[in-house]
């Protein structure tokens, strides 16, 4: 599993947020509809606000059920990362993220399957065999590269962690 641990300073996630049900496999139609409802110009505006890592447009989940039960509601934020000192436009939701350690997992392949398989492998393989555990905070997906039709992609899954 392609993984690295990063010590990241405090930052904020800003963007457009919605409550959606958690779906474990396949595309989440609620998230797809939400993203499609945003004008293309809004995606471009968000990109111009990003000034820290993780870079680019991000898929953020927050407020997830601790047991990750399918069908439970979570907050999905379509946005970008900005430095803690940056000011966000008033029309955007903000998730403040404290400084801390992150496990960053890279996935390549069929989208969203390769990403979902990586999620599952973190719980079933990586966490049980490493001295880290999840800490409170959002989960972040960064799309590093993708096919034009989005059937394949290279992604990074950022999970907040602390030493076990």
Model-derived regions, located:
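A solvent-exposed interaction/effector surface
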Residues: 1-164
